[in-house]
Amino acid sequence: MSITNEQILDAIAEMSVMQVVELISAMEEKFGVSAAAAVVSGPAAAAAVEEQTEFNVILAAAGANKVAVIKAVRGATGLGLKEAKALVDGAPASVKEAVSKEEAEALKKELEEAGATVEVK
């Protein structure tokens, strides 16, 4: 004779809370499992997959041709000569922040052609 699920549920329903806790503990030991709830991280995983839309262009080093780099920085940012020179001399420094990927890549290419070392973050 086999015991049905209905009979098992009826037997558990008649148990006290302490008896149910002991039953769960015994089942965990016998089957090598844990009754702990699994952690679900749905929204956090979706945020990690989200693609970055804003980038910062960082001048890591001016390189050998500092004058050309200063001109490129002035053209890209609209800074005056003194401000652009200070930015280039203060490398590593942020040239532009929160720009699109296309704009960041174009600026990186322009600065690298002038001889600078550039990072896009």
UniProtKB/Swiss-Prot annotation:
GO biological process: translation
Gene3D superfamilies, per the entry: 3.30.1390.10, Single helix bin
Keyword DNA-binding annotated: no
Any one annotated GO CC term: cytosolic large ribosomal subunit
Molecular function GO terms recorded: mRNA binding; structural constituent of ribosome
Keyword Acyltransferase (UniProt): no
Any Pfam family hit: Ribosomal_L12_N
Alphabetic keyword roster: Ribonucleoprotein, Ribosomal protein
HAMAP family: Ribosomal_bL12
Function of the molecule: Forms part of the ribosomal stalk which helps the ribosome interact with GTP-bound translation factors. Is thus essential for accurate translation.
Subunit: Homodimer. Part of the ribosomal stalk of the 50S ribosomal subunit. Forms a multimeric L10(L12)X complex, where L10 forms an elongated spine to which 2 to 4 L12 dimers bind in a sequential fashion. Binds GTP-bound translation factors.
Family under the similarity heading: Belongs to the bacterial ribosomal protein bL12 family.
Name recorded for this polypeptide: Large ribosomal subunit protein bL12
Organism ancestry: Bacteria, Pseudomonadati, Pseudomonadota, Gammaproteobacteria, Vibrionales
Gene name of the encoded protein: rplL
